[in-house]
From Swiss-Prot:
Coiled coil: none
Positions occupied by motif Cell attachment site: 274-276
Protein name: Hydra actinoporin-like toxin 4
Signal peptide: 1-17
Primary role: Pore-forming protein that forms hydrophilic pores and causes cytolysis. Compared to equinatoxin-2 (AC P61914), it reveals lower cytolysis activity (5-12-fold difference, tested on erythrocytes), a larger pore size (probably 2-3 nm) and different affinity to membrane lipids (100-fold lower affinity to sphingomyelin). Binds to sulfatides. Shows cytolytic activity on HeLa cells, with a different potency than its paralogs (from most potent to less potent: HALT-4>HALT-6~HALT-1>HALT-3>HALT-7>HALT-2).
Keywords (A to Z) from UniProt: Cytolysis, Membrane, Nematocyst, Secreted, Signal, Target cell membrane, Target membrane, Toxin, Transmembrane
Comp. bias intervals (Low complexity): 60-75
Compartments (UniProt record): Nematocyst; Secreted; Target cell membrane
Pfam families assigned to the protein according to its UniProt record, in alphabetical order: Anemone_cytotox (PF06369)
Length: 302
């Protein structure tokens, strides 16, 4: 029995030794794999560390920076910085207003000055024209001269080729002691085309009445005032003598006479003369001196 126990112990010890050797061999064989595992794990770790770096590159610049742009778009200029401008304008307003007022005042004064100057020049030109026209149209102022009056009007009137189809010239002799003051005209067809001027005593005035066109006559009334009376001179150079024969009429009355009264002999006016016959009305002689030139003469004795 004892021997059997010894044999069993021997085999048990031998088995333990064999197992230890096997463990050593297996452990030696397994070491490279462990190292490989360690290396693989290290590469994995490296790859893991590399990936975040690549992510950093791929990641766009901080997208959270738009707030900075929004800060720029937001009113950076504080509204509090604008008050200085209103302060300057408020302080300069009175000065600017004064300057503008002075400029406007100067402009108004200049405009008034130029306007008055133009008026004065116009008055001077008008008065000079009237004086020249008066000298030409009244003929000789020292004595009544029909020929001188007609010559004067011919020198300033149109040339024969430019004369209208119908017209009449009238020379008015003032044999009274008072001036015949020109009061204007009452047109019927056409109008006076020359200056109608006053006629001093013992002087002769002359004017020309023209038609408006070749298809109308020259007809109307010219008025002169002498004291409280009015000398009304009517003449009509008709477009067609066969249809309209009345030519001239004169009347001294208290008012301006109409063309119809003098042409038709109404309301106290006598019937007009025809074809240059002599006529006397209220002490005034009137007649056609030249039918071809339509020269009409009025002699006013007062």
């Amino acid at each position: 029995m004892l021997l059997f126990k010894l044999i069993v112990c021997f085999f048990f010890i031998f088995a333990i030794g064999a197992n230890e050797n096997k463990k050593d061999e297996t452990s030696g064989e397994n070491e490279p794999s462990e190292n490989a595992d360690v290396n693989s794990e290290a590469s994995v770790v490296k790859e893991a560390f590399k990936k975040p770096a690549s992510r950093k590159v791929n990641v766009k610049p901080p997208a959270a920076k738009p707030p900075a742009a929004s800060k720029i778009t937001k009113p950076q200029v504080p509204p509090q910085k604008k008050p200085p401008a209103p302060k300057q304008t408020t302080t300069k307003k009175p000065l600017l207003a004064n300057i503008e007022g002075k400029i406007k005042g100067a402009a108004n004064e200049t405009t008034k000055y130029l306007t008055n100057l133009a008026k004065e020049m116009g008055k001077e030109a008008e008065s000079a024209l009237k004086e020249k026209a008066k000298e030409a149209l009244t003929g000789l102022l020292d004595k009544a001269d029909i020929n001188g009056a007609f010559n004067a009007i011919a020198s300033i009137w149109k040339n024969n080729e430019n004369k209208p189809a119908r017209y009449w010239k009238c020379a008015v002799e003032n044999l009274s002691e008072e001036t015949l003051v020109a009061l204007g005209t009452t047109p019927y067809s056409g109008n006076v085309k020359t200056v109608l001027s006053d006629i001093p005593p013992q002087s002769t005035g002359v004017f020309v009445w023209e038609s408006d066109s070749a298809l109308t006559g020259a007809a109307g009334v010219v008025h002169y005032q002498l004291g409280d009376k009015i000398l009304n001179i009517m003449a009509s150079d008709p477009y067609d003598w066969t249809l309209y024969g009345a030519w001239a009429n004169v009347r001294v009355s208290d008012n301006k006479e109409t063309f119809d009264n003098l042409y038709s002999g109404k309301n106290g006016a006598q019937y007009p003369t025809k074809a240059g016959n002599w006529g006397i009305a209220d002490g005034v002689k009137f007649f056609l001196t030249n039918n071809k030139e339509a020269e009409f003469q009025v002699i006013f004795s007062g």
